A protein has these predicted regions:
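Positively charged, polar, low-complexity stretches
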Residues: 2-89
Length: 89
């Protein structure tokens, strides 16, 4: 990986850091485990997801079915492992 590629990944990792540790955990897990092997479409969707503020992200994780953008819905569902959102059981 080039130095520029490494710097770009560091910037994306920094954008995964949020005001809530729960969001840090979810976003950083996806970034660390799946971002580098994701296809271009999923990378673009993840970067778009990072543009949202924390309250919107919380709503996305709570109910992914309500997300209008199919790319973001796919990333959220992949992070959660389902389309049903986070539920206490």
């Amino acid at each position: 990986m080039t130095n520029n590629g490494s710097i770009e990944l560091s910037k994306i990792r920094w954008r995964c850091r949020r005001g809530l540790k729960e969001l840090d955990f979810l976003l950083l897990n996806y970034f660390n485990q799946k971002y580098t092997i994701a296809d271009a479409e999923d990378k673009e969707a993840f970067l778009h997801l990072l543009e949202f503020q924390d309250p919107a992200l919380i709503e996305f994780f709570a109910d992914p079915k309500r997300i209008q953008d199919p790319g973001i819905r796919r990333i959220i569902s992949e992070i959660l492992g389902s389309n049903d959102g986070y539920q206490l059981k």
